[in-house]
């Protein structure tokens, strides 16, 4: 069997063989450290019972390590130029399928139904293209897919925001959106030096364990997220001002918003970043009652 893909020498050989040039627009940074890849697979808890969805396999460095341990790996690759490379580099593995499609446009549930019938669990494990990290993760969460969890490499700053706690400078609407659906934990930091080409930012691996039920029960999830988004619209403004200025018809309903805050025992002079997800749940339900 071939030597591991994820070494500097082998990666260079593969890229030279195919005359591959990186597309900045696709956020292509390939990992060249097998130890880090192994640790990612460890954090994902992949076993011979696991089906894995990978997004952006590149030349197959992570795919290869997943294929060694998983029952089945299905990878979404948007860049047509990588398809013949993947066919070559992953030829030793008969448990890998590559789908040439943008995962944001894919029917992921249908792919799961088709690919993973004989798997006990499904994980998403990926080194995500940084420019579409958040849309990809939110799509996977909002579609309520039967996933056990998501373990992905992403920009450290984004990982910090996803796992942030109230009253920290990283805490915001993304923290709440991710933690509504999952338990989020940053499991490792990754230096720039283990990629080609080197990215401009530091990276981290985050583990998102899917909750059986959302973190909080709310009457209307869409309205809950609307309230959260409004509360963080301008971080320096008070919660009351943000709600008035950013909720639909907020300015005409100042007194109702004030009443909802009082009923929820939340001081309108606080800032959105100081509220826990539980407080946002109470507030959004009360706002819904008085506004809708």
UniProtKB/Swiss-Prot annotation:
Catalysed reactions, semicolon-separated: adenosine(1518)/adenosine(1519) in 16S rRNA + 4 S-adenosyl-L-methionine = N(6)-dimethyladenosine(1518)/N(6)-dimethyladenosine(1519) in 16S rRNA + 4 S-adenosyl-L-homocysteine + 4 H(+)
Could you tell me the superkingdom of the organism this chain comes from? Bacteria
Q: Which SMART domains match?
A: rADc (SM00650)
- Binding-site positions, S-adenosyl-L-methionine: 29, 31, 56, 77, 102, 127
Instruction: Name the cystine pairs.
Output: none
What keyword terms does UniProt attach to this protein? Cytoplasm, Methyltransferase, RNA-binding, rRNA processing, S-adenosyl-L-methionine, Transferase
Claim: Transferase is one of the keywords in the record: yes
Task: Look up the EC number in the record and give it.
Answer: 2.1.1.182
* One Pfam family cited in the UniProt record for this chain: RrnaAD
Which GO molecular function, any one, fits this protein according to its record? 16S rRNA (adenine(1518)-N(6)/adenine(1519)-N(6))-dimethyltransferase activity
Q: Which GO terms describe its cellular component?
A: cytosol
**Keyword Transferase attached:** yes
| Compartment list | Cytoplasm
Q: Which family does it belong to?
A: Belongs to the class I-like SAM-binding methyltransferase superfamily. rRNA adenine N(6)-methyltransferase family. RsmA subfamily.
Function comment = Specifically dimethylates two adjacent adenosines (A1518 and A1519) in the loop of a conserved hairpin near the 3'-end of 16S rRNA in the 30S particle. May play a critical role in biogenesis of 30S subunits.
What protein am I looking at? Ribosomal RNA small subunit methyltransferase A
Organism expressing this protein natively: Bacillus licheniformis (strain ATCC 14580 / DSM 13 / JCM 2505 / CCUG 7422 / NBRC 12200 / NCIMB 9375 / NCTC 10341 / NRRL NRS-1264 / Gibson 46)
Taxonomic lineage: Bacteria, Bacillati, Bacillota, Bacilli, Bacillales
């Amino acid at each position: 069997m071939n030597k591991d893909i994820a070494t500097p020498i082998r990666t260079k050989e593969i890229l030279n063989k195919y005359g591959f040039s990186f597309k900045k627009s696709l956020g292509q940074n390939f990992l060249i450290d097998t130890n880090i890849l192994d640790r990612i697979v460890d954090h994902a808890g992949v076993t011979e019972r696991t089906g894995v969805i990978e997004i952006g396999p590149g030349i197959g460095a992570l795919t290869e390590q997943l294929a060694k341990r998983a029952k089945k790996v299905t990878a979404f690759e948007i860049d047509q130029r990588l398809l013949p490379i993947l066919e070559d580099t992953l030829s030793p593995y008969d448990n890998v399928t590559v789908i040439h499609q943008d995962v944001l446009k894919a029917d992921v549930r249908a792919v799961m139904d088709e690919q993973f019938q004989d798997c006990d669990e499904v994980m998403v494990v990926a080194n995500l293209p940084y420019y579409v990290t958040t849309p990809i993760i939110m799509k996977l969460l909002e579609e309520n897919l039967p996933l056990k969890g998501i373990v992905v490499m992403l920009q450290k700053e984004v990982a910090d925001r996803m796992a942030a706690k109230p009253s920290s400078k990283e805490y915001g609407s993304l923290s709440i959106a991710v933690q509504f659906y999952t338990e989020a934990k940053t499991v490792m930091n990754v230096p720039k030096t283990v990629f080609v080409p080197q990215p401009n930012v530091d990276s981290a691996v985050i583990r998102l364990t899917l909750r059986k039920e959302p973190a909080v029960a709310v009457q209307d999830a869409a309205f809950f997220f609307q309230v959260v988004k409004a509360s963080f619209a301008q971080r320096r403004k008070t919660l009351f001002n943000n709600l008035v200025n950013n909720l639909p018809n907020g300015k005409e309903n100042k007194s109702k918003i004030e009443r909802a805050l009082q009923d929820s025992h939340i001081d309108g002079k606080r800032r959105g970043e100081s509220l826990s997800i539980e407080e946002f749940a109470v507030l959004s339900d009360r706002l819904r009652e008085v506004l809708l």
